[in-house]
Amino acid sequence: MPIMPDTWIRQMAREKGMIEPFVEAQKREGVISYGLSSYGYDARVAEEFKIFTDVDSAIVDPKNFASNSFVTRTGDITIPPNSFALAHTVEYFRIPRDTLVVCLGKSTYARCGIIVNVTPLEPEWEGQVTIEISNTTPLPARIYANEGICQFLFFQGASPCEVSYADRAGKYMRQSGVTTPRL
């Protein structure tokens, strides 16, 4: 499964709408970088965040998710110490049938104890990506909206898969905004 280069990512974004909006060159001046890189795409975090809180003493249960588990905030945010937030990408992704996408955090945030987690983007999945952001430090941590948050790496299979995410009618297909757990 080879990793795909900038030329392929650019072509797929232009011709197939794989990433919209697509930033052709990496933006770096005065911001946490985002846009096309050599072998990946650095996505931006949008302005909507759901920060987990214990105000209502809710239990986080993936089978019965309670909306009072978090508070919604917009713009640049601060994640409390040892806490967690959900966010989503500015970009909308359309993954080709022969491609699997893996996400890694940005070193700028990782070096501050901020960890980003995203499950793989499966073949023929599409939508805005919900991002999990953990503040592993004992201090409040700042997250900047509309700046880079993670890097997506595109791996192309030797042949298209037999059953894609779209074929399975996956529950997170075409998600928009922050999407909480579904069964």
UniProtKB/Swiss-Prot annotation:
Residues holding dCTP: 106-111, 151, 165, 175
Involved pathway(s): Pyrimidine metabolism; dUMP biosynthesis; dUMP from dCTP (dUTP route): step 1/2
Biological-process GO terms, alphabetical: dUMP biosynthetic process; dUTP biosynthetic process
Keyword Nucleotide-binding found: yes
GO molecular function annotation: dCTP deaminase activity; nucleotide binding
Keyword Hydrolase: yes
A Pfam family that the UniProt record links to this protein: DCD
EC number, UniProt record: 3.5.4.13
Active site (record annotation): 132
UniProt catalytic activity: dCTP + H2O + H(+) = dUTP + NH4(+)
Keywords: Hydrolase, Nucleotide metabolism, Nucleotide-binding
Subunit-structure text: Homotrimer.
NCBIfam families in the cross-refs: dCTP_deam
Task of the protein: Catalyzes the deamination of dCTP to dUTP.
HAMAP family in the cross-refs: dCTP_deaminase (MF_00146)
Protein name, per record: dCTP deaminase
Naturally occurring in which organism (per UniProt): Gluconobacter oxydans (strain 621H) (Gluconobacter suboxydans)
Designated gene of the protein: dcd
